[in-house]
């Protein structure tokens, strides 16, 4: 990995989570259907909370998926890319349970969460201040709620479509709560790029990612077939629906309301005491 901005950069390391929407988004680059002369790309797939924590410790990957909640803790090393994000349009992570808790009731139970630095947890802490939580790997939350280890769980990824067939009830949809509070979409996760790579590499990578997303959207069946290996028990129509929720025209460009939503999310997190310091949101454009 280059250590200086002026170093010749031939290989770009990319890390993202092993879920169907990220796999779909990066398909163009991973399959080399999208190529950039003079550059090659390596891909590492790891769950989002691990990527959040790793980015906090060091700028190991050139480009990394992160939760927007993690950005305040990595902003010295990384800038947000203006594309490649997952945004909920009135929907998002959910608190689910085996029975229909009221909000007052669910405040008094321990909720399994997929990570301290996930955006899901940030919104949970704003919606239900002081609620007791415990970290559980995201793919174990539904099984552990079903087993009775936790009364409720905060689910992300494909669980948003599968909880009902497991007999669980949605207590609160964070995307709905956020939209009611702000009138804005809920920005969940994005991609960040090392600041020290410099503007020319930032611009190259922005275009490469847009081209990758664009390729997948134009060759949907091909890209979806690749994404199915990460779809966690979703059938093809459900995976297609899930991918459509989080990889779309807004993934190509957040738009002004999308960028405002990111700023508002992090500012509100600070105002409500969840994020300890003010956040400077800037994009590598």
Predicted features and spans:
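Hydrophobic/proline-rich hinge and linker segments of small-molecule sensing/allosteric domains
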Residues: 82-103, 179-196
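Beta->alpha turn/N-cap motifs
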Residues: 47-49, 55-72, 137-138, 155-161
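Hydrophobic residues within well-ordered alpha-helices
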Residues: 55-57, 145-146, 205, 269
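Secondary-structure end/capping motifs
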Residues: 197-268
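Bilobed "Venus flytrap"/periplasmic-binding protein-like clamshell domains
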Residues: 8-31, 93-152, 156-158, 260
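A structural signal for short loop-to-beta-strand junctions that line the ligand-binding cleft
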Residues: 12-13, 77-86, 110
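Pocket-lining segment of extracytoplasmic ligand-binding domains
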Residues: 139-229
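A local structural motif
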Residues: 34-45, 127-140, 275-281
């Amino acid at each position: 990995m280059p250590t200086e901005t002026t170093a010749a950069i031939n290989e770009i390391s990319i890390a993202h989570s092993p879920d169907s929407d990220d796999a779909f988004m990066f398909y163009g680059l991973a399959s080399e259907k999208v190529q950039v002369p003079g550059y090659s790309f390596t891909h590492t797939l790891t769950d989002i909370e691990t990527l959040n924590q790793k980015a906090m410790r060091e700028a190991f990957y050139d480009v990394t998926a992160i939760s927007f909640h993690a950005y305040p803790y990595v902003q010295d090393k990384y800038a947000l890319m203006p594309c490649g994000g997952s945004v909920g349009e009135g929907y998002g992570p959910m608190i689910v349970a085996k029975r229909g808790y009221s909000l007052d009731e669910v405040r008094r139970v321990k909720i399994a969460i997929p990570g301290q630095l996930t955006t899901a947890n940030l919104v949970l802490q704003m919606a239900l201040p002081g609620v007791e939580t415990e970290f559980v790997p995201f793919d174990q939350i539904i099984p552990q709620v079903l087993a009775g280890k936790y009364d409720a769980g905060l689910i992300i990824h494909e669980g948003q479509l599968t909880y009902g067939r497991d007999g669980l009830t949605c207590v609160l949809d964070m995307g709905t709560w956020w939209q009611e509070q702000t009138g804005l979409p809920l920005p969940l996760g994005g991609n960040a790029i090392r600041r020290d790579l410099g503007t020319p590499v930032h611009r190259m990578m922005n275009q490469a990612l847009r081209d990758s997303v664009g390729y997948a959207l134009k060759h949907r069946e091909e890209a979806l077939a690749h994404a199915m290996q990460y779809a966690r028990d979703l059938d093809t129509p459900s995976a297609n629906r899930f991918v459509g929720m989080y990889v779309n025209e807004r993934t190509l460009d957040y738009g002004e309301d999308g960028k405002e939503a990111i700023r508002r999310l992090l500012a509100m997190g600070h105002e409500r005491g969840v994020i300890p310091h003010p956040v400077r949101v800037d994009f590598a454009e």
